[in-house]
Curated annotation (Swiss-Prot):
Gene transcribed to yield this protein: xseA
UniProt family annotation: Belongs to the XseA family.
GO molecular function: exodeoxyribonuclease VII activity; nucleic acid binding
Gene Ontology biological-process annotations: DNA catabolic process
CDD domains membership: ExoVII_LU_OBF
Locations listed in the record: Cytoplasm
Name used for this protein in its record: Exodeoxyribonuclease 7 large subunit
Function, in words: Bidirectionally degrades single-stranded DNA into large acid-insoluble oligonucleotides, which are then degraded further into small acid-soluble oligonucleotides.
Catalytic activity, reaction form: Exonucleolytic cleavage in either 5'- to 3'- or 3'- to 5'-direction to yield nucleoside 5'-phosphates
């Protein structure tokens, strides 16, 4: 009679077979991700093909080592071991390593990292720095032996001779390339003599260009205080460094042109244009001032200069009349006061009263004399100043009528007694002045 096995015994037997089978200890498996929902730690999902499904488990330590994000429907290649879970009697694969399937693996990783960095704001235009219009020194991070550095040197030297180029020799592909790019970006930012950086390399496959897609390189370019031009690969090649850089150039030549937006010829043309504009502006100003002088020359003051002192003549007349009226008024007041006092003296007999009025009369006369003299002096001073001004202005009218004015050191000579033999005199005439020497004088 045959012995019947329990389910547990059968499951244990199968588990022992699975555990001891060398083919199941390290399985290479291809499948499509199904029923995936990202969890905080360990990941549980299925791998399937057209005909079968297997449960898959990835512990947190293995999941953190992935260079890409798992997604529903993604086809992946995994390495793991197959085991049986006794309580349910089901078998599954414990995944230790996983990569996207086929040649699109790096492309998937590229798109996933691009999406992540975009969401974090690394590619926003608001973070882009403006390139300087004029540069004196340009840093270049690239291979010292490639065509990139030669093209950059040739183009910059042609466009703007005198711009210095500082090369930071850098490994641009393979293991350690990303770290070397980051180190040289940091080194360049420590210098104070650089105006901008060009980071780039020649064309190649996506694997060759991958160093410029590394997240640490993107972070280094984003943090750079120097403006950075990215020139990686050919025009059709696009890297994450292109997205984060301040400007992207399709070729090294284009990068050099962006680094020198203004050429030497542009500056010479600009200076010539400025000189011409300055000349035209000066010419317009001279014409404007000439027209102003012509207008002033036709004004009434220059055609009828006597109008300059008409007001002074009127003022002198007013001062003269005011002085006469003031003197007459003071004299009239004095006579009236004297008549009043005399009348009172005639009608009063007391000696004391007479003496008192005599003293008041004397005081009044003194005050009147002082006041009249003060006002007379003030009016005379004002009259003399006005008369001097009038005489100064009037000399030109005298000369204009054919007379001459003789001066000795700015003093007008009015008599032959004022000069002696050998004195030097200046004679002012209508159209100029001559100097003469006295031959026969006092």
């Amino acid at each position: 009679m045959s012995d019947y096995l329990s389910v547990s015994h059968l499951t244990k037997y199968l588990k022992m077979k699975f555990d001891r089978d060398p083919y199941l200890e390290r399985v290479y498996l291809t499948g499509q991700v199904s029923n995936f929902r990202k969890r905080p730690n360990h990941q549980y999902f299925s791998l399937k093909d057209e005909n079968a499904v297997i449960q898959a488990t990835m512990w947190a330590s293995a999941y953190k080592r992935l260079a890409f994000d798992l997604e529903e429907g993604m086809k992946i290649n995994v390495i793991g071991r197959v085991q049986i879970y006794e309580p349910s009697g089901s078998y599954s694969i414990i995944i230790e390593e996983a990569v996207p399937d086929g040649i699109g693996a790096l492309a998937i990783q590229f798109e996933q990292l691009k999406k992540k960095l975009t969401n974090e704001g690394f590619f926003d235009d608001k973070h882009k720095q403006d390139l300087p219009q004029f540069v004196q020194k340009v840093g270049v991070i690239t291979s010292p032996s490639g065509a990139v550095i030669r093209d950059i040197i040739t183009t910059i030297s042609r466009r703007f001779p005198g711009v210095e180029i500082l090369l930071f020799p850098t490994k641009v592909q393979g293991e350690g390339a990303a770290e070397e790019i980051v180190a040289n970006i940091s080194k360049a930012n420590q210098r104070e003599d650089l105006d901008l950086l060009i980071v780039g390399r020649g064309g190649g496959s996506i694997e060759d260009l991958w160093a410029f897609n590394e997240e640490i390189v993107v972070h280094a370019i984003f943090a750079s205080q120097l403006p950075i031009i990215s020139s990686v690969g050919h025009e059709t090649d696009v890297t994450l460094s292109d997205f984060v850089a301040d400007r992207r150039a399709a070729t090294p030549t284009a990068a050099a042109e962006l680094a020198t937006p203004v050429t030497k010829a542009d500056i010479i043309s600009w200076i010539s244009e400025r000189q011409n504009r300055s000349y035209q502006a000066t010419l317009r100003l001279l014409h404007q001032k000439r027209d102003q002088v012509m207008v002033l020359g036709q004004s009434v003051i220059f055609r009828q200069p006597e109008r300059l002192y008409d007001a002074y003549l009127q003022k002198i007349d007013r001062l003269h009349n005011s002085l006469l009226n003031s003197i007459k008024s003071k004299l009239s007041d004095s006579r009236q006061a004297e008549m009043t006092v005399s009348h009172r003296l005639q009608t009063m007999n007391l000696l004391s009263t007479i003496n008192r009025y005599q003293e008041r009369l004397m005081t009044l006369n003194q005050w009147l004399n002082v006041d009249m003299q003060k006002q007379f002096d003030q009016l005379r001073t004002r009259f003399e100043k006005a008369q001097d001004a009038l005489l100064t202005l009037d000399t030109k009218r005298i000369v204009a009528r054919g007379y001459s004015i003789v001066r000795q050191e700015d003093k007008i000579i009015s008599s032959v007694k004022d000069v002696s033999t050998g004195d030097l005199l200046a004679i002012e005439m209508r159209d100029g002045q001559i100097e003469v020497e006295v031959k026969n004088g006092n």
